[in-house]
Amino acid sequence: MSAPNQFFATAATLLAIATGAGACAHTDYFPGTTILRNEENIKIIETVEQYRRRMLEHNVDGLLVLASSTYFEDSGTPRSDDDYGYEGLKQVLSSKLKLVKSLRYEIEYRNITVRGNRADVEVFLDGSFELAAEAGDRYRRLNDYHQFVLERENEQWKFVRGM
């Protein structure tokens, strides 16, 4: 083979290898989702999973560490008397979690949207719990779509709504 033909054959082989390698590259997603597996989304999901584990442990102090000092919950109603901030979150968690005798709580991640230092995490909650009550224990199920809102504070993601 002449030198020019050998050059073109080598170049064509290298081009085919490079093109083939590029074609094998793929975007990495969290299993069973269309959520990109990148450093930011990993940190966000790790934060939400810490929340889920601490709920299962009834760990009020651990949950409060995950909440921003600017936390605000409007409870989704037009009334303002059921809205609360960080201090109210302390009271809600303390009073409600001590009534929970058993808890099953799973989170299915649907979407994560990050805009600057804010992340909206769309999930499907699947859970059940047993409440201690004066009239006897009560069982409840939870199956619903939900949204957590987090903000980045000092390189950590903190909940500002949805806990």
Task: Report residues per predicted region.
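Extracytoplasmic/secreted proteins, especially bacterial periplasmic and envelope-associated proteins
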Residues: E39, K43-E46, Q50, G62, ...
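Short beta-strand edge/turn micro-motifs at domain boundaries
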Residues: A25-T33, D120-E122, R138-M163
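Short, low-complexity N-terminal intrinsically disordered segments enriched in polar/charged residues
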Residues: C24-E57, V65
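Hydrophobic pocket/interface hotspot
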Residues: Y51, L63, Y71, L89, ...
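Sec-dependent bacterial lipoprotein signal peptides
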Residues: M1-C24
